[in-house]
Amino acid sequence: MLRTACSRSHVFKAFSSSLMLEHALAAANSSGAAAPTNAASTGNSHDSTLKSELPLRTLNDELHNAERKYIKPLTNAPEWSSTRTGPNSKIREYLKNGQYTKLLIRLSVDNHLNNEYISGLFTTGGLTKSEYSLFINKLLSEEELDVKLSNVIPDTPHTELIYKLYEFYCDHIVDQHNLTPLQLYDLNLFLKTFIAEAQLSKAHNVLDFILLRRPLNDLLANTDVEILIQFLRLKCGALSKFWKIQPASQRNSTAITLGEKASDCHLAKSYKFQNEKVLLQIINSVLGEHNWKNRRSPKLDAAIIYSLGYLGQTDLIEKYVNRTWSPSKDEGVKTNPNSDLLVAVLTSYCVKEGNMRKGLEVLDRFIRDYPEVELDPLFWRRLLQLSSLLWDKKRDRKATLSHGCWTIMKQWHAQRQRKIPYDYGIMKELYPIFVRTKNKNGALEVITKSFFGAFIQPEFTIRPNELSLLCKYQRFILKMIALKGNYHKGFEFCQEWSFSSTNKFELQSYFMKWRGIHEQRRTSQSKQKAALQEKYDEMEEDDMLLGRLW
């Protein structure tokens, strides 16, 4: 056990990789708390207890609490290794080794997340509140958590397990009236998780719990950016993936949801704008109050633009953009816009006005004023998706708008001497456009420059859906080659652009199938032409005989 007199700087240096320290720093930064330049030394336990009861802690208090409650007990390695029995020691072993998913599985299977059992851990000291906060923070930050927690308890969705953890957090960690920056950070993680899983009712419960202890006026006064963004998403329509849009070529069909094509996107059954009055209040505070001047960000502006777009207030979008992002304005943000902001502008105009012209004009202005702006795959994916949805297949058989977006994407990368990065979402959006317009050259460009450019990388691991899409591109190209009668090019493609011997054999078989179909069509067309010619000759001969009789 570290001695109490050990300085905090020594503790942090010895355990700079401690997860709890990262958690406390992230919590303080996300809530806008300022870190003092000179940290005071550790005081007595009575002073620390008084600090923990304050409604808002400074970063220094959070670090002090992290050291006292978590770092010192965690660093007593000899004591841990000698304690081999009892469930409490096993829980701490999981925490020490970073096995947060396994800990949840153990609690779920052995105790079914029993409330009395968790309460007992807090009472007996088997689990501290700081350790539980760390557990929540790291668990919800793990990738593919839904896959790891699938079927932990039969017929119990993993979101129910997470919601159970949230209920424990509210009952045992949070004070009845106030929220610390660390607690606000943890609750925001629950919010993000439930929104990502399309569990909007659960997300609303978390947000309402936060608003009871920190109302909207307090969020605006304290410039709580992250929570305000979640508020706009849940109550003001800023969740664009749940928006409904009517495809241009299917005006009489059911509207589709913007996010339904994404393989990793969970969709809610319903999504409604719940609060129209507060949006103007939020905009006035963000633009008018001095404490927001250095707290605004492209992410927050994107959420506000989505909210305005959901209401159809495209005129206000242009005014907001001119007010916040005009380089000539002193109050304008001094950072560059990002893809999230540009996607918000484009989506809002396209979905509510039904055309991309105005949205593209605003985007051109952004790119002209901010030449260093980065357009990531998310931007190009949404650009192609919107162009496909607005494509009227009867009036525009060549998909001029979609191919124009594809050309702009290639030009943007070429001007910066970059290769087009591989992105499954982009390739998936392009495939039906190429097939419908029979654009073999575009598909060949995707195969040769994007797909195989990524697959040859040693660290790249192809997924089943990516492999399936690649095979679709290959078969489409071979079909178009076969139907044009270019047999040599077909076998050359199979030889050069197959990724395995099995794939090569399948491509050759597929090519021969369509080659046979093409030959049958040619033979059938030749017979039809011969029959028509014969019929014409007979008619001409009859006319000549009739002429002689006359």
Curated annotation (Swiss-Prot):
UniProt keywords (A-Z) are: Mitochondrion, RNA-binding, Transit peptide, Translation regulation
What the record says about family reads: Belongs to the AEP2 family.
* Subunit structure of this chain's protein: Binds to the 5'UTR of the OLI1 mRNA.
Q: Does the keyword Zinc-finger apply?
A: no
Signal sequence, renumbered to the chain: none
The GO terms describing molecular function are: RNA binding
Q: Which domain of life is it from?
A: Eukaryota
Q: Where in the cell is it found?
A: Mitochondrion
Per the record, the GO terms for biological process are: regulation of translation
Q: Which InterPro entries match?
A: ATPase_expression_mit (IPR024319)
Q: Cellular component GO terms, alphabetically?
A: mitochondrion
What protein name is recorded for this chain? ATPase expression protein 2, mitochondrial
